[in-house]
Amino acid sequence: LTELMKCQKMQQQEVSVQDTDAVIEAVLKSMADFEGLPHRLQYVGTYRGVRYYDDSISTIPEAAINAAMSIPDAKTVLIGGMDRGINYDLLVTFIRKHKEFQFICAYASGKRIFGEVGDCENCVYAEDLEQAVEAAVQMTEPGGACILSPAAASYGYFKNFEERGETFQKYVHAFAQ
């Protein structure tokens, strides 16, 4: 009877291990197939060796900083939009400290941020998103990544963050190819 119980226990453990392997395979497949939400660090494509990401939903400085730090080999960050009068000190400090990134500022909040860090060689100003993407295509070296992460609202320039993100993607496809 003891041998029979041992045999049953071993069979149960084998089934358990097989079930675990199946679960792990299913999880890995789900992770590989997972597509994030649109405009949340959404991968746009790779052109001339540069990866482009759309984080248009980013409307605060912390989101732009997190985007820059979370994308491997991020080199260029496009920031700016409607100036709501929020405090950009955290982002200004980040720009000053992190010379490994190029920042392209646009629109009203970008103009204000650029005014605070204009003496930094890693920060330039562009009038609008079209100019910002053109500059990013020229500035971002192959092997690097470019992120639209505005740290500002889209209103006054776009209907919403979705339209801003779609416009960014359109410019990337047009200029980067």
Outline where the language-model segments fall:
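Phosphate- and divalent-cation-binding pockets in alpha/beta enzyme and binding domains
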Residues: 63, 112-115, 157
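Residue-level preference for the first positions of well-ordered beta-strands
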Residues: 74-76, 143-147
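Short glycine-rich anion-binding loops that position phosphate/pyrophosphate groups of nucleotides
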Residues: 82-84, 109, 151-155
